[in-house]
Amino acid sequence: FNLAYAKKFSQSISGGLNLKVVSMALPNARAQGIALDAGIRYVTGDQEHVKFSISLKNIGPPLSFSGDGLSIDMLNPSTSISIGMQQRVSSYELPSQLNIGASYDFNFNENQKLIIACSFSANSFSKDQFRGGAEYTLKTEKASFTLRGGFVYEQSLFNSIEVSTALSGPSGGFSFNFPFGESGSDIGIDYAYRQSIFGGVHSVGARINIGE
């Protein structure tokens, strides 16, 4: 269950809240609670080309499991009578996360654009991460081309034993877009690569947009 609210406070500032129910279940045991996500975005510049954002995720009280799955039967050695007992469990915190990001758009002209972005993620149960990336787009009358690249860094990134996530290191990709007809239809081809400790992932896609 999610309940979200978003509002644009001014031409430059917008924000949102998301209240959600968090539930985790094991055989005959369950932990349930609520958590909050919140974020705010600021846009400035003559062409709205400078953007800042900050968000908090999974903010909420600790959770703990309860249910019949925690009950055990033990034999009282003095009376030889079986007694039902409830195991004590410790509560645990949600994996909260703080994200801070910024981007800058270089609008060279109507046909060329470069976007540079960076972000920082502070994780409560894993290593903090720094991200950086860029996207360049070139448009012509017959086609448009987009080139993308990025990098995710965390401590001990190049140590295969101590690295905490597979989704780190370099990534890149490109897109071709070919318009056809007079109704705004186009055909697109996308390719992306992401490095991981498992050898990397290649993704290829194609799309067709039919105009009115």
Per-range role (PLM):
Residues 1-212:
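Outer-membrane beta-barrel porins/channels
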